Amino acid sequence: MRLTQGAFSFLPDLTDQQINKQLAYIVSKGWSANVEYTDDPHPRNAYWELWGLPLFDVKDPAAVMYEINSCRKAKPSYYVKVNAFDNTRGVESCSMSFIVNRPANEPGFLLQRQDFEGRTMKYTLHSYATEKPEGARY
């Protein structure tokens, strides 16, 4: 099951050329970029590991691409994403986020249903990947 988080997640994986165009857009807007990675694909896992330091005031998309490739090389079977932070007053938020690397095999999720009081159903998502210890999931 393909993980769909961030922009472009329903499209085929971005090529390096397409990633460079997105990075050029991020730089042209004056946004700060950072690279994050994880092996826990749960949709509510908002706290991915930060790769290096955030790239503030970067003027060349090649610097961000270098960090992406370094992370891909060190973590080839992890999810890797780029976040772009807009520090404009009133926005001050992540304005763009997209995945740039995926594991070769994405095992998907188990939907667990639980009967609860008053005929209420509770649902829980469980990633098959998390059945293995951290660092050995893919």
Curated annotation (Swiss-Prot):
GO terms for cellular component: chloroplast. One of its GO terms (biological process) is reductive pentose-phosphate cycle. Pfam families: RuBisCO_small. The keyword Transport does not apply. CDD domains: RuBisCO_small. The keyword Cell cycle does not apply. It is found in: Plastid, Chloroplast. GO terms for molecular function: ribulose-bisphosphate carboxylase activity. InterPro entries: RuBisCO_ssu, RuBisCO_ssu_dom, RuBisCO_ssu_sf. Belongs to the RuBisCO small chain family. In this alga, in contrast to plants, the small subunit is encoded in the chloroplast. The basic functional RuBisCO is composed of a large chain homodimer in a 'head-to-tail' conformation. In form I RuBisCO this homodimer is arranged in a barrel-like tetramer with the small subunits forming a tetrameric 'cap' on each end of the 'barrel'. RuBisCO catalyzes two reactions: the carboxylation of D-ribulose 1,5-bisphosphate, the primary event in carbon dioxide fixation, as well as the oxidative fragmentation of the pentose substrate in the photorespiration process. Both reactions occur simultaneously and in competition at the same active site. Although the small subunit is not catalytic it is essential for maximal activity. Heterohexadecamer of 8 large and 8 small subunits. This is Ribulose bisphosphate carboxylase small subunit. It comes from Porphyra purpurea. The lineage of its organism: Eukaryota, Rhodophyta, Bangiophyceae, Bangiales, Bangiaceae.
